[in-house]
């Protein structure tokens, strides 16, 4: 079995408070990747609360985003529609860059099967995508972990390139270059 992890494909990361033209540019690639994928898909949902600016993350990144139940928190419409049509799409909320529950959810859902690979796409490569890729690599050390960078955006072009270097050095395969 293969697993596709779609990281934080939420309105605030695409067109909202943390959105960018680059994030909008890669969205069709993510939609196509989901459409063409036949196995398990898991979407992470970055989730914050009204007190976000008082948190450690909020003090270092003082841009309110992905506040639970707001429009910015919601999964982007095209991906949301696909999740309704796709019978093997799970979601997991996370309150930090990486989700401790993501590896456990994947493991529990795939009991009795062999995971051939886990591929990640989404937002933001140098923060949440890299955090989840490394969590998954630590949890599943003998499973191929890959990131399709044609389906990712980052906080800057420099951060994008640095993330690829770090991921490669941690034995995460880079695709879509």
Label the predicted regions.
Residues 29-34, 130-140:
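Histidine-anchored nucleotide/phosphate-binding helix
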Residues 10-11, 48, 96, 125-127, ...:
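Short, glycine/serine-rich, charged loops/turns that create anion-binding
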Residues 141, 172:
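Short phosphate-binding/catalytic loops that engage adenosine nucleotides
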Residues 22, 101, 128, 155-156:
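Secondary-structure boundary/capping motif
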Residues 1-91, 146, 155, 161-165, ...:
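Active-site acidic carboxylates
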Residues 69-127:
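Internal catalytic-core helix/loop-beta-alpha segment
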Residues 118-124, 144-157, 175-177:
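A short glycine-rich beta-strand->turn/loop micro-motif centered on a GG-aromatic cluster
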Residues 53-55, 102-104, 131-132, 158-159:
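Short, well-ordered secondary-structure micro-motifs
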